[in-house]
Amino acid sequence: MTEIKLRIYEFKIFDKVKEFHAEIQAYSKSYSYSDEGPEESVVLNKDGLDGYKLISTFQLGYSDLFEYEFDFFIKYLNEDFTSEKYHLFRNNCRHYAFNLIRILKPTRGYIGVKILQDLNDMSEVLGKLIRGFLLVVIIFSVGLCFLPEVYKDYLLILVLILLYKQ
């Protein structure tokens, strides 16, 4: 039996927007995922490294899975979590940690699942807001450059509608 821990770190995107990084500790190693691909390391705490700030560590209980069984599962999981498939909001470290919890099935894994689902929901909302804002800026900029003066009021109404729907 091995103890399973979920670590949540805070870091900043563009030195402004808070984002959260998740990693799983099992078998005396840390497992995480980033834009560089899956990472397995003996460094069990990234606090202070590369702008990471440890927010919390959650004890998820113990797993009955042997390490060699876990290694077998993680080999196939890593095929879906390559550096090319990384996406800040849709395929990230929290999704990776979520899948690791599903494989390990720790005794209190439901805690980690709930935390990761909530963080992913927050991240998806942030992603939608950023995409919506960029879309509005692009439409507004193009409209101001090319539309005749008569249609610029309608452009403003369209932008307000798009902002409201986000």
Residue ranges of each PLM-predicted region?
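C-terminal single-pass membrane-anchor helix
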Residues: 127-166
